[in-house]
Curated annotation (Swiss-Prot):
The gene is APP. This is Amyloid-beta precursor protein. The keyword Cell membrane applies. Residues 1-34 are extracellular. Proteolytically processed under normal cellular conditions. Cleavage either by alpha-secretase, beta-secretase or theta-secretase leads to generation and extracellular release of soluble APP peptides, S-APP-alpha and S-APP-beta, and the retention of corresponding membrane-anchored C-terminal fragments, C80, C83 and C99. Subsequent processing of C80 and C83 by gamma-secretase yields P3 peptides. This is the major secretory pathway and is non-amyloidogenic. Belongs to the APP family. Its main location: membrane. Functions as a cell surface receptor and performs physiological functions on the surface of neurons relevant to neurite growth, neuronal adhesion and axonogenesis. Interaction between APP molecules on neighboring cells promotes synaptogenesis. Involved in cell mobility and transcription regulation through protein-protein interactions. Can promote transcription activation through binding to APBB1-KAT5 and inhibit Notch signaling through interaction with Numb. Couples to apoptosis-inducing pathways such as those mediated by G(o) and JIP. Inhibits G(o)-alpha ATPase activity. Binds, via its C-terminus, to the PID domain of several cytoplasmic proteins, including APBB family members, the APBA family, MAPK8IP1, SHC1 and NUMB and DAB1. Binding to DAB1 inhibits its serine phosphorylation. Interacts (via NPXY motif) with DAB2 (via PID domain); the interaction is impaired by tyrosine phosphorylation of the NPXY motif. Also interacts with GPCR-like protein BPP, APPBP1, IB1, KNS2 (via its TPR domains), APPBP2 (via BaSS) and DDB1. In vitro, it binds MAPT via the MT-binding domains. Associates with microtubules in the presence of ATP and in a kinesin-dependent manner.
């Protein structure tokens, strides 16, 4: 359920800061290894998105 919710939040164009704070809270809430892996994957997606947007802006 939380994965779908986070996916919906990513489609919503709010600030990256907000996403980062939600990721931190999400990581603190989930203590299992699965939660940590999901958190890392989502964090990687955010970083990749920022890089892509930066490259597009520079062109």
């Amino acid at each position: 359920i939380s994965e779908v919710k986070m996916d919906a939040e990513f489609r919503h164009d709010s600030g990256y800061e907000v996403h980062h704070q939600k990721l931190v809270f999400f990581a603190e809430d989930v203590g299992s290894n699965k939660g940590a892996i999901i958190g890392l994957m989502v964090g990687g997606v955010v970083i990749a998105t920022v890089i892509v947007i930066t490259l597009v802006m520079l062109k």
